[in-house]
């Protein structure tokens, strides 16, 4: 779709993104025309994950006062499973030892109802006690060597089988009892999807009946038996999800089971009305934008259905400290990334008692600010014109060769390059490449989307024929949907090159020659005019051009890096292109044979970042909807609301950006140019989180303003008529 038409359409029908291509299969006939679904009601969530000694040992009114103070309108409360926090009547459903004759869950539910909150009740189905083991030993998970699986954190507990009678029978009874007694809006089950392959008698029999095979002996991703088990596992979990959801709806038709962690994003989006994203914090070497990644991956299939982002106030690392507290700055940046990318925040506190209150002021400050600007957070559609494709089938079916290791880093490198380039973007599910799902985007990026079916490739051809542009890297389309190698790229007609039967690498001490042609530099070399050359990628696909191309980036082949006396190029230049650029009507195609996206993630070369950004902007071939100038690293997202549009600016500039936690925030100044939607007039400009009206200028169709000293998050809002 042309940019003019896109902006016009989003201006007129802001909710079109939520409706396009997403079947309305689940809410029809449940809500009257005058009754809004509860799913969209609540904007600020809290989770209290009780521990067994909480009843009688903590002050529930303290939490109710805190909820009121920070404008909580949705709660997630622990109810049952491993421990019941209500007077259950189900045999073997362990009641908290500290409850006595009280109903601690019922008290909180009653008081939260008085405050008009949405209520989700949490169960935990992953572990059972000794008495349950003795009564139903077949309900317990079994290891590959035939041993009942003891819990890794507490040896007097047993890990349950997720796919057997414990969940299908016992937990179904628990969920029905909870629904009958408390009538929540939904049930959320912790660790319901299991912990790898279970070898219990039920799994052996059920997998054999479904596949004719014995259970796999290893979890090797590319093993054909393991792949069949993965499909069967997904089907069993879907059956369990649908069972629980059906039983819940029988009792309260508007309630739902919330399938957090279900291993198929397409099915998750198709069959969910509401979702909790449970990536609570970061650990290891990963930027804060990893919180946004999950929301972006779900949005293609969920549309604008609500996504609640659970965040921990403590550390989430291999060695678990569940009563810990993260730094104020780390909590703020993690939450900001979620909110800026369309998630509704939900803090989780383990245990009702507080040993360290430092997190509470940070959460209160954020929630109070988000409450004040709530109407600007009720998004109806993203406005990004760039879509980055992700592929679950590539991640499941592709690999095995040395150059295919760490293949997830293609997407991570491209994602980070988009962030560094301040380019607003959404993600695109490779199973949803039809016209309806792609019409919002002028450009699709395929970061080594290697495994594509013939039909998926035809959909991409139709997208290009309609005026869409493409940037693709490395082995994109060189394998079919089952991971079987093709003789040539399925998209060779778009790329204009053919596969030359090998992948080279590692390309040690190889370089990219950056050069002008006909006395000028190509736009992909903007900011690199004085470089002459830069480092090459680590691996590259050998290709043969099938047509003429410009040659702004060519190969300087590998030469020795030791001994030092031998470190000189044997060939100063070649005519072998490392970037293939072509135009067709309104479409532009860029194919990068090297693994530049993955190499960027591994090396973090600033030149690779510039090349990727420049190539993306060249292929976009239209004025960006938002242009941001800053010396920092700022994530930019753009949204429509009913009577406004917003630009979120999340400041990731920090010495701890790549490995948290942040110690403190480092404010940056940002200049912003925003394109006004066609046929709309700007009636006001706001900086929402500092609650000010900035100076701004309108020239033609562009609003320009400066936003100084952004510590973590700012939202620029344009009121529109």
Per-region residue spans from a language model:
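Glycine-rich, aromatic-flanked loop segments that form ligand/cofactor-binding clefts
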Residues: 45, 74-77, 107-150
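N-terminal export signals
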Residues: 5-28
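Active-site-adjacent "subsite" loops/lids of carbohydrate-active enzymes
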Residues: 125-182, 217-230
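Aromatic-lined carbohydrate-binding/catalytic grooves of carbohydrate-active enzymes
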Residues: 70-102, 130-138, 203, 265-274
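Carbohydrate-binding surfaces of carbohydrate-active enzymes
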Residues: 226-721
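Active-site neighborhood of glycoside hydrolase catalytic domains
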Residues: 166-261, 265-268
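Aromatic- and glycine-enriched glycan-recognition loops and surfaces
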Residues: 52-70, 93-115, 239, 409, ...
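C-terminal segment of N-terminal export signals and the immediately downstream linker at the start
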Residues: 21-44
């Amino acid at each position: 779709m042309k940019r003019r038409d896109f902006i016009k359409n989003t201006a007129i029908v802001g909710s079109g993104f939520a409706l396009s291509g997403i079947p309305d299969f689940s809410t029809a006939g449940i809500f009257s025309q005058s009754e809004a679904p509860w799913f969209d009601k609540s904007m600020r969530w809290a989770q209290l994950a009780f521990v067994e000694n909480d009843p009688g040992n903590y002050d529930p009114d303290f939490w109710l006062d805190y909820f009121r103070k920070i404008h909580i309108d949705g709660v997630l409360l622990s109810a049952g499973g491993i421990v019941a926090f209500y007077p259950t009547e189900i045999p073997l459903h362990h009641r908290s030892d500290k409850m006595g004759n009280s109903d601690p869950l019922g008290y909180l539910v009653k008081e939260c109802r008085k405050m008009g909150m949405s209520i989700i009740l949490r169960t935990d189905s992953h572990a059972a006690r000794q008495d349950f083991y003795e009564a139903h030993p077949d309900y317990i998970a079994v290891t590959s060597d035939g041993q009942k699986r003891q819990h890794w954190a507490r040896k007097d507990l047993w890990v349950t089988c997720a796919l057997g009678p414990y969940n299908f029978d016992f937990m179904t009874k628990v969920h029905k009892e909870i629904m009958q007694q408390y009538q929540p809006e939904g049930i959320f089950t912790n660790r319901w999807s299991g912990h790898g392959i279970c070898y219990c008698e039920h799994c052996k029999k059920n997998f054999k009946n479904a596949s004719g095979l014995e259970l796999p002996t290893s979890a090797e991703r590319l093993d054909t038996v393991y792949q069949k088990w993965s499909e069967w596992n997904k089907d069993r979990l879907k059956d369990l999800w649908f069972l629980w959801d059906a039983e819940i709806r029988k009792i309260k038709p508007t309630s739902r089971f919330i399938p957090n962690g279900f291993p198929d994003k397409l099915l998750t989006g198709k069959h969910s009305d509401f979702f909790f994203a449970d990536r609570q914090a970061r650990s290891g070497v990963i930027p804060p934008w990893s919180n946004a990644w999950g929301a972006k991956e779900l949005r293609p299939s969920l549309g604008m259905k609500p996504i609640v982002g659970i965040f921990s106030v403590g550390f989430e690392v291999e060695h678990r400290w569940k009563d810990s507290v993260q730094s104020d700055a780390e909590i703020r940046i993690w939450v900001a990334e979620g909110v800026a990318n369309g998630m509704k925040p939900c803090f989780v506190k383990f245990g009702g008692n507080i040993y360290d209150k430092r997190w509470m002021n940070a959460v209160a400050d954020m929630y109070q600010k988000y409450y004040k600007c709530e109407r600007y957070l009720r998004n109806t559609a993203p406005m990004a014109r760039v879509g980055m494709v992700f592929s679950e089938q590539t991640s499941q079916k592709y690999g095995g060769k040395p150059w295919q290791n760490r293949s997830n880093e293609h997407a991570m490198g491209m994602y980070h390059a988009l962030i560094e380039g301040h380019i607003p973007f959404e993600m695109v599910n490779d199973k949803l490449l039809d016209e309806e799902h792609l019409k919002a985007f002028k450009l699709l990026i395929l970061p080594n989307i290697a495994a594509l079916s013939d039909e998926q490739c035809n959909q991409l051809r139709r997208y290009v024929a309609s005026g869409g542009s493409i940037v693709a890297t490395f082995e994109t389309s060189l394998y079919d949907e089952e991971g079987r190698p093709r003789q040539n790229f399925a998209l060779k007609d778009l790329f204009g090159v053919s596969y030359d039967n090998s992948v080279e690498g590692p390309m040690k001490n190889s370089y990219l020659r950056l050069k002008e042609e006909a006395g000028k530099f190509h736009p992909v070399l903007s900011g690199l005019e004085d470089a002459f050359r830069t480092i090459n990628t680590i691996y590259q696909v050998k290709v043969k051009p099938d047509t003429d191309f410009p040659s702004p980036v060519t190969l300087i082949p590998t030469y020795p890096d030791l001994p030092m006396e031998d470190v000189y190029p044997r060939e100063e230049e070649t005519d072998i292109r490392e970037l293939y650029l072509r135009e067709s009507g309104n479409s532009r195609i860029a194919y990068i044979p090297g693994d530049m996206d993955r190499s960027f993630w591994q090396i973090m070369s600033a030149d690779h970042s510039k090349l990727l950004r420049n190539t993306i902007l060249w292929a976009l071939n239209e004025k960006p909807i938002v242009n941001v100038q800053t010396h920092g690293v700022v994530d930019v997202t753009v949204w429509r609301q009913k009577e406004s549009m917003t630009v979120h600016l999340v400041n990731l500039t920090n010495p701890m950006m790549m490995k948290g936690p942040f110690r403190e925030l480092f404010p940056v100044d940002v200049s912003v140019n925003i394109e006004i939607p066609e046929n709309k007039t700007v009636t006001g400009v706001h900086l929402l989180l500092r609650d000010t009206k900035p100076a701004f200028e309108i020239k033609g169709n562009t609003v320009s303003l400066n936003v100084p000293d952004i510590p973590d998050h700012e939202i620029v809002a344009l009121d529109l008529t």
